[in-house]
């Protein structure tokens, strides 16, 4: 049976989009700048030298970056790729995770999300009062834009003493809630997020994110793998839902199910960290052979651990770690399978601030029936969803053009 294995390298942009100036992101290039820093010896913590990505290079990542940005990533292997490679522009209004993923699955976000734009006192008082009342809270902390790690150091101890949850946001359409797993309780945090999700309906906010953490005090706090995203449902049927409705298997690895609000997902594998994500992907490929299938994984640590934290050396090391296991999936492909590597937005670790960057994404497609070579600029991320639909014999999506035609 035909299958599509889709691996999302969360935040691996490959060059600023034409509308990047609108977002303050003109000149951003997540991969290009990581490669530049690595080649210059400025990303040598835990690794050293130029980026060593032989397998991603074989997939055409460097060549896709060159098509997108006009220059080849410094230090990467320029050998001819064995896959189809190109880059895609985003037509969705935002540079956030749901917008990128939904557009990849054929449903671009052509409306404007709601945002909490004020950096301090970010949330409407009426909303905060309603959350406190309905959840029976002693109060709240934060109410601001913040980096997830910084705000734990600043407010984590007070949260543990008072039981007040930490509320914060970013440039994305998001309401984030951080609570200590042991002193506050994980299920209690999830219930608080559910209440908040319901109260946010009039505000058109994309996601509520539970951000559980552990640790004894400042400098010792760490997020756990029990993050949970409560997203609104996509406004139309994604290619995932179309396959599920047709009786196929749609397998979520990691946070994919949360991003699509669990719509169109038939099987879920919880996984945290690269090794678990790789292992779960390989397990799913072994288990789902008898029906047409989409197996989709999100490698979130690129974004959450290195992009937002502006950790260039960590991002470089993570790319090399990802690259080392890529051959396992390539070897597990059947004769009629395709492997697609892409991203959902950028998050340039060399860029000012802590937010995502508006960039093109790589579109890399490998398979025994796939013609290697350039597929050029794709007018929308939805070309990926359209290509998956074509590969699996599903009805055409409303957006996108297949690069497999």
Curated annotation (Swiss-Prot):
EC number: 5.4.2.7
UniProt keyword terms in alphabetical order: Cytoplasm, Isomerase, Manganese, Metal-binding
Catalytic activity annotation: 2-deoxy-alpha-D-ribose 1-phosphate = 2-deoxy-D-ribose 5-phosphate; alpha-D-ribose 1-phosphate = D-ribose 5-phosphate
Keyword hit for Nucleus: no
CDD domains: PPM (cd16009)
Binding site for Mn(2+) 1: 10, 344-345
Gene Ontology, cellular component aspect: cytosol
Biological processes, Gene Ontology terms: 2-deoxyribose 1-phosphate catabolic process; 5-phosphoribose 1-diphosphate biosynthetic process; metabolic compound salvage; nucleotide metabolic process
Cofactor info, note text: Binds 2 manganese ions.
Cofactor(s) the record lists: Mn(2+)
InterPro entries, sorted: Alkaline_phosphatase_core_sf, DeoB, Metalloenzyme, Phosphopentomutase_DeoB_cap_sf
Main localization (coarse): cytoplasm
Binding site for Mn(2+) 2: 303, 308, 356
Primary enzyme class: isomerase
Pathway involvement of the protein, from the record: Carbohydrate degradation; 2-deoxy-D-ribose 1-phosphate degradation; D-glyceraldehyde 3-phosphate and acetaldehyde from 2-deoxy-alpha-D-ribose 1-phosphate: step 1/2
Subcellular location: Cytoplasm
One Pfam family of this chain: Metalloenzyme
Assigned protein family: Belongs to the phosphopentomutase family.
Role of this protein: Isomerase that catalyzes the conversion of deoxy-ribose 1-phosphate (dRib-1-P) and ribose 1-phosphate (Rib-1-P) to deoxy-ribose 5-phosphate (dRib-5-P) and ribose 5-phosphate (Rib-5-P), respectively.
Record's protein name: Phosphopentomutase
Organism field: Chromobacterium violaceum (strain ATCC 12472 / DSM 30191 / JCM 1249 / CCUG 213 / NBRC 12614 / NCIMB 9131 / NCTC 9757 / MK)
């Amino acid at each position: 049976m035909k299958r599509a294995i889709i691996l999302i390298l969360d935040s691996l942009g490959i060059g600023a989009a034409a509308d990047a100036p609108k977002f303050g992101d003109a000149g951003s290039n997540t991969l290009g700048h990581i490669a530049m820093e690595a080649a210059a010896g400025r990303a040598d913590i835990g690794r050293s030298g130029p980026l060593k990505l032989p397998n991603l290079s074989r997939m055409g990542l460097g060549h896709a970056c060159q098509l997108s940005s006009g220059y080849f990533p410094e230090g990467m292997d320029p050998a001819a790729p064995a896959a189809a490679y190109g880059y895609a522009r985003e037509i969705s209004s935002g540079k956030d995770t749901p917008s990128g993923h939904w557009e990849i699955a054929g449903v671009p976000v052509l409306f404007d999300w709601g945002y909490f734009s004020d950096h301090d006192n970010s949330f409407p008082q009426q909303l905060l009062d309603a959350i406190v009342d309905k959840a029976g809270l002693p109060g709240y902390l934060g109410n601001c834009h913040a980096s997830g790690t910084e705000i734990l150091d600043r407010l984590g101890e007070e949260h543990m003493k008072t039981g007040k949850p930490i509320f914060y946001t970013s440039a994305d359409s998001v309401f984030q809630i951080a609570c200590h797993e042991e002193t506050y309780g994980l299920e209690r945090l999830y219930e608080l997020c559910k209440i908040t999700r319901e109260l946010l309906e009039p505000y058109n906010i994309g996601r509520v994110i539970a951000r559980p953490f552990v640790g004894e005090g400042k400098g010792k706090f760490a997020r756990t793998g029990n993050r949970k995203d409560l997203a609104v449902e996509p406004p139309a049927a994604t290619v995932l839902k179309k396959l599920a409705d047709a009786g196929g298997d749609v397998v979520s690895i990691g946070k994919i199910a949360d991003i699509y609000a669990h719509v169109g997902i038939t099987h879920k594998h919880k996984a945290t960290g690269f090794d678990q994500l790789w292992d779960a992907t390989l397990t799913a490929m072994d288990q789902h052979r008898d029906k047409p299938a989409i197996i989709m994984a999100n490698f979130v640590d690129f974004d959450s651990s290195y992009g937002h934290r502006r950790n260039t050396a960590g991002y470089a090391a993570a790319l090399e770690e990802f690259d080392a296991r890529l051959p396992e999936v390539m070897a597990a492909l059947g004769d009629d399978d395709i492997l697609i590597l892409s991203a959902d937005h950028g998050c340039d670790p060399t860029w000012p601030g802590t937010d995502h960057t508006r960039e093109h994404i790589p579109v890399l497609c490998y398979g025994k029936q796939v013609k290697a070579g350039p597929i050029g600029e794709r007018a929308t991320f939805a070309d990926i969803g359209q290509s998956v639909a074509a590969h699996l014999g599903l009805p055409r999506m409303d957006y996108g053009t297949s690069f497999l035609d």
